[in-house]
Amino acid sequence: MILILFYIILLFEIINGIWCLYRVIRYNNHNNKLTENSNESKLENSKILIVIPCLREQDIIISTLQHFLKLTSNYENIKILVVTTQKEEYEKQKYLYLQDDLKEDVKNNIDIKKMITKYNKILSTMELKDILKLKLNNNIDRIVENKVKNSKTTSKIVEEYIESRKLRDKVYHKHYPNNEGIMADQLNYVLNNFNFIDEGNYYYSVYNADSIPSENTIKEILKTIEKNKQPKVIQQYSAPISNWNNLSAIMKGFAIYQSNFELRYGLINSNIPNRLLYTYVVGHGMYIRVDVLKKIGGFETKYWCEDIYMSYVLRTKNIPICPIKTLELMQSPQYLSILTRQNAVWFKTSFECLKIFKDVFRKNKKINLNSLGWMIQRLRMNMTWFGLPIAFLYTIIVAILNQNIGILTVATLTYLSMILLEYGSIIRLLENTSKIKLGNKFKILLYTTAAATISNIGPIYSLISQKKEKYKTIR
């Protein structure tokens, strides 16, 4: 029985690798046909509101705003809105008591990763790094006190920037007034408090504070709206490689691992419509018509990842996701500890897929093939995410216990073949789509192999920690 399971795992790995390679090849063929048949079209004058929700984004929000202003400078029908939250100010005041601990940790030369995790609610990452540069200064206590005292919230920084540059006709700012809540609450606050005129011709777009969509994004979005006669949902998928050169080897591996998910289940599956394939929207790079968004009840606040819930709702209502080819480049976490917590947040909502299924059923009182297909696929993905590294470990342990170098070699080569077929094809697709050369492919595959082998650290942490509060990814 042990060896039967061993060979079943090996068979699954080979099938998975071949299936992944096949879908990339099919996408490339499909994409080439679209390119050959594409024509320039008149850009529809649909209105777009780009919403950027922020919580402790002091370090990057201005550069992000500058990027979006440049991106939309030629379009009067596109506006930008930053929505901050009172939660940021509330938590800063709540954790000010840590100031004395911070002074001691600076003097004791505590690791920067630990300091960022512990003190991110009272100082930004850049502010903490600035303090560490002066750690040998005799007046370090005063330096810390002044830094904390003069630290500005994201809301304050945004307001000052808009006012000083006279941007109120192009950039709006709304401030979610509650001390609690998650990103979905901020997004719903905008949905309910912004004056959308002609909702069927107005798109509500969401981007993160670290989003860097390319110059071609807006053009392709408007062409997609025109070509598809105002589709209900448009999605720009992403790749976390904007800070590629600042990542360690293992974190580069995880950047490819995450890009694989985005491109395979997002870009590829959305371009090849099939009820058996899993498709999803992401909480950044999404464009959804305001009338549709209001009809489905806005953004779900019961679950930490509102996009997983929305993906299911769209699937049950048979609302297709219209993808664009241009990728959004975003940051990848620089530290494994931060990535683990980020993945734990994603897995928590994913793990609650049966609960989501029941919640939506109570509202709609009906089940269709789309909803069943989504749930089955999500369960399969959860099992793969959590179980594949364990399955590989199982094959290695079985080979060692049997003291059989032959099956150890087969187990290792089968796993590496799966990695090569799955991620080798994705690395090439990622480079072609993003127009960025990532470097030595052999090294990247080694990094990705290491990351894939421990890719269930987030799910494991999620099940063990049982955190009651959503983790905010630290930039």
What role is predicted for each listed range?
Residues E57-K70, Y90-K94:
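Short, well-formed alpha-helical segments that are part of the catalytic scaffolds
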Residues D198-I212:
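Short beta-strand-to-loop acidic/aromatic patch adjacent to the donor-nucleotide binding site
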Residues W19-N45, D359-M375, N402-R475:
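Juxtamembrane C-terminal module of membrane proteins
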Residues K302, S311-L329:
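Catalytic donor-sugar/metal-binding loop of nucleotide-sugar-dependent glycosyltransferases
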Residues S46-P53, L65-F68, I78-T84, H173, ...:
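Hydrophobic targeting segments
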Residues Q66-N77, Q86-E89, D101-E104:
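Short, acidic, metal-binding catalytic loop of nucleotide-sugar glycosyltransferases
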Residues I162-K166, I182-D198, E215-Y303, A344-K355, ...:
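Long helical/loop segments within the catalytic core of UDP-sugar-dependent glycosyltransferases
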Residues K92-N201:
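Active-site-proximal specificity loops/subdomain of glycosyltransferases
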